[in-house]
Regions:
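Terminal domain-initiation and capping elements
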Residues: 1-99
C-alpha cells in the first residue's frame, strides 16, 4: 500500500469589490420619473425613493444602492434602456466603493 502525502494550503479569500450605482441630476428628467426608476429598479419604497430623488436634485447625484460589479452593471444598463425608451436623459453611473 502506498501512502501519498497531501499538502493543504489555506487560501485567503478576497472580499469582492462593491460598486455604488448613482443617478445624476439633469435639467430635463422629471422628478416623478426618477422616483419611478428608484421604485422599479432599486426596489425603494415611495418615501425612500422621494428622499433619494430630492438628494439627486439638490446635490447633483445620489447613491441608489451598493452591489457586486455584475449586479451594478446590470442595473445601470436597465436604467439606461428604460430611460431611453421613455425619452428621458437620466444617467446612472458606477463608482467603486473603497473598503
Amino acid at each position: 500500500m502506498t501512502q501519498v502525502a497531501t499538502k493543504t494550503s489555506k487560501q485567503k479569500l478576497k472580499i469582492p469589490k462593491r460598486f455604488e450605482v448613482l443617478l445624476l441630476n439633469d435639467d430635463y428628467t422629471s422628478m416623478d420619473f426618477v422616483v419611478e426608476v428608484l421604485e422599479r429598479f432599486f426596489h425603494k419604497e415611495f418615501l425612500a425613493a422621494e428622499a433619494i430623488m430630492l438628494k439627486i436634485h439638490i446635490d447633483g447625484e445620489a447613491v441608489c444602492g451598493t452591489y457586486s460589479f455584475d449586479v451594478a452593471q446590470t442595473k445601470v444598463s436597465q436604467v439606461i434602456e428604460y430611460s431611453r425608451k421613455n425619452e428621458q436623459p437620466l444617467m446612472p453611473v458606477l463608482r467603486e466603493v473603497n473598503l
